């Protein structure tokens, strides 16, 4: 069994990597990928904590987080496709200059 600290450290590292991707990257697709990494890091923390205390609640929360991430990804990708069709660009600085 993996110790609690190792799993939580891995989840924290993944969360920081995702947060870095969201804050530093200017491309909306990479920002969406960073957000997905952050959601998966939180889900990993739930599984590790549930495994440590011998409860199935962590796995239930993992399923909930994955379904939330799937819904967020599908809506986000649909919006990105529409944005790319209209502006031919996914750079957040260029998109913020759109009129309307």
From Swiss-Prot:
Catalytic activity, as annotated: a quinone + NADH + 5 H(+)(in) = a quinol + NAD(+) + 4 H(+)(out)
An example Gene Ontology biological process: ATP synthesis coupled electron transport
Record-listed E.C. numbers: 7.1.1.-
Membrane topology: Multi-pass membrane protein
Family membership: Belongs to the complex I subunit 4L family.
UniProt subunit comment: NDH-1 is composed of 13 different subunits. Subunits NuoA, H, J, K, L, M, N constitute the membrane sector of the complex.
Name by which UniProt lists this protein: NADH-quinone oxidoreductase subunit K
Organism: Erwinia tasmaniensis (strain DSM 17950 / CFBP 7177 / CIP 109463 / NCPPB 4357 / Et1/99)
């Amino acid at each position: 069994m993996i110790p609690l600290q190792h799993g939580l450290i891995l989840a924290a590292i993944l969360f920081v990597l995702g947060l870095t991707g969201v804050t530093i990257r200017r491309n909306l697709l990479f920002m969406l990928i960073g957000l997905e990494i952050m959601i998966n890091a939180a889900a990993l923390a739930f599984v590790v904590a549930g495994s440590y205390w011998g409860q199935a609640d962590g796995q239930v929360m993992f399923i909930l987080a994955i379904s939330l991430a799937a819904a967020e990804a599908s809506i986000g990708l649909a919006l990105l496709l529409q944005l790319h069709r209209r502006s031919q660009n996914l750079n957040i600085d260029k998109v913020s200059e759109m009129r309307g």
